[in-house]
């Protein structure tokens, strides 16, 4: 009887813990290695089993951590953080621990990939970019050192094809542009670099989004909005131009995909999916996050910390300010500020005070 009661209480405790954690959504930048996924949520890094479950927070620093990438052996986690101002590359044990900063270059740094042997981290940066707005790709040792530029004129994404001494890369654009059906001069295309032949070969010819190249299972996987205009996963054999759809979403885009060569993890409709490369099985996993939801709490905010534009008139006796979507009239001497708009559901900006101080245009 006592044993049955103990088992019942244990099950009750586990069930209560599962209920206490809400299923999260709007995750970004997931990375996968075998049975572990790390992602960004509430500007921190979290870890969860690849089959889903309760996530564990890995970082708590007030700055933002994103662009995480698990190392090829799964022991290390590289990511971008804004701990000391400009975004920089950091590395820490994948189980959690003290981050170590690896880059100090101007122009920021966003982690893109690991080299296949796990000795270096590839990142993109405006460092050394004299003309233009496209970043370059660099590598830095896992123990630090001077960054080394990859043999490209420019680049934003990369995926290695180690068995052929090649890598796939995107030369331009930003994969985070959410312009639908964009076909302008900054659309992303995918190229192949051969380190032996020193050649650069275009892989895609679709005028539109060709992004996130990934090498897995002897094929190139990538994201494209060809077809219905929604970004989906596609596969393509190198040496051909024939792309086959893997996912066929018609509502929300496939975003932030990453592969460890066996599985592809991505976000769609704010939720995490895992695609098994060998079988083609695609599963949306349930991620419960035990967050305290601190960002959703009601709190008192001083608008002076959010002043954006200002105007002065009435002989310098008064000023109008725009802060957090409202317009305020503030005396330049003593006296209280007055919220002239007070519309929490509408944003007002660029206020201008009339010469007599009686009317405000915005």
What does each model-found stretch correspond to?
Residues 1-4:
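Positively charged n-region of N-terminal signal peptides that target proteins for export
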């Amino acid at each position: 009887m006592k044993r049955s009661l103990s088992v019942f209480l244990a099950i009750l405790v586990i069930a209560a813990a599962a209920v206490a954690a809400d299923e999260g959504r709007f995750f970004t930048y997931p990375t996968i290695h075998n049975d572990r996924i790390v992602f960004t949520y509430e500007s921190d890094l979290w870890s969860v089993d690849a089959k889903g479950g309760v996530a564990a927070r890995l970082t708590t620093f007030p700055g933002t951590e994103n662009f995480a990438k698990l190392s090829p052996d799964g022991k290390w986690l590289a990511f971008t953080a804004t701990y000391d101002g400009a975004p920089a590359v950091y590395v820490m044990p994948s189980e959690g621990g003290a981050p170590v900063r690896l880059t100090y270059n101007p122009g920021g740094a966003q982690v893109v990939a690991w080299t296949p042997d796990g000795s270096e981290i590839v990142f993109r940066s405006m460092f050394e970019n004299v003309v233009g707005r496209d970043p370059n790709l660099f590598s830095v040792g896992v123990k630090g050192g001077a960054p080394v530029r990859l043999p490209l004129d420019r680049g934003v994404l990369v995926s290695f094809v180690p068995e052929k001494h090649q890598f796939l890369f995107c030369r331009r654009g930003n994969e985070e542009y959410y312009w639908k059906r964009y076909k302008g001069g900054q659309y992303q295309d995918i190229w192949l670099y051969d380190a032996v032949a020193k050649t650069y070969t275009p892989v895609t010819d679709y005028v539109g989004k060709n992004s996130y190249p990934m090498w897995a299972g002897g094929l190139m996987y990538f994201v494209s909005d060809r077809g219905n205009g929604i970004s989906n996963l596609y596969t393509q054999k190198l040496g051909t131009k024939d792309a086959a759809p893997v996912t066929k979403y018609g509502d929300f885009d496939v975003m932030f995909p990453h592969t460890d060569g066996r599985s592809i993890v991505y976000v769609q409709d704010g939720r995490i999916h895992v695609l098994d490369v060998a079988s083609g099985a695609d599963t949306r996993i349930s991620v419960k996050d035990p967050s305290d939801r601190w960002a959703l709490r009601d709190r008192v905010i001083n608008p002076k910390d959010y002043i954006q534009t200002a105007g002065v008139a009435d002989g310098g006796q008064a000023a109008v300010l725009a802060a957090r979507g409202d317009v305020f009239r503030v005396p330049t001497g003593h006296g209280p500020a007055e919220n002239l708009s007070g519309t929490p559901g509408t944003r007002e900006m660029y206020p201008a005070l009339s010469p007599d101080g009686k009317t405000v245009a915005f």
